[in-house]
C-alpha cells in the first residue's frame, strides 16, 4: 500500500518528542507499505488492534492513535492525524 503522506506522519511523530512513537510509526509504515490490503479483514490480520470508525481506520501506536483514510482500490492509506489518547477521546477528528 502507498501511504499519503509519509512526511506528515513522521513530522507528527517527531513533534511529540516521544522516541518510542517515532519507532512505532516507522514499524507501522514498514508493515503498511509491505502489504497489499484488499479489505478491512486483511488489514486486521496484520494490525490486530485496528478499528474501523466511520470511514477511517484507527491504529493503536501505544499511547497514540494513528487515523487514516483508506482506498483499497487505489491501494493507499491517507494520513489524517496522529493523536494522543486524550485528544482522540475528544472526538474532534471525526468531523
Go through each PLM region and give its residues.
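Basic, Lys/Arg-enriched alpha-helical interface segments
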Residues: 1-65, 71-78, 85-95
Amino acid at each position: 500500500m502507498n501511504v499519503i503522506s509519509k512526511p506528515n506522519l513522521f513530522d507528527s511523530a517527531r513533534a511529540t518528542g516521544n522516541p518510542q512513537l517515532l519507532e512505532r510509526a516507522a514499524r507501522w509504515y514498514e508493515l503498511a507499505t509491505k502489504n497489499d490490503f484488499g479489505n478491512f479483514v486483511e488489514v486486521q490480520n496484520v494490525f490486530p488492534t485496528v478499528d474501523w470508525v466511520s470511514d477511517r481506520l484507527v491504529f493503536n501506536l501505544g499511547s497514540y492513535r494513528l487515523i487514516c483514510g483508506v482506498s483499497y482500490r487505489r491501494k493507499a492509506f491517507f494520513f489524517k492525524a496522529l493523536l494522543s489518547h486524550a485528544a482522540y477521546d475528544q472526538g474532534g477528528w471525526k468531523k
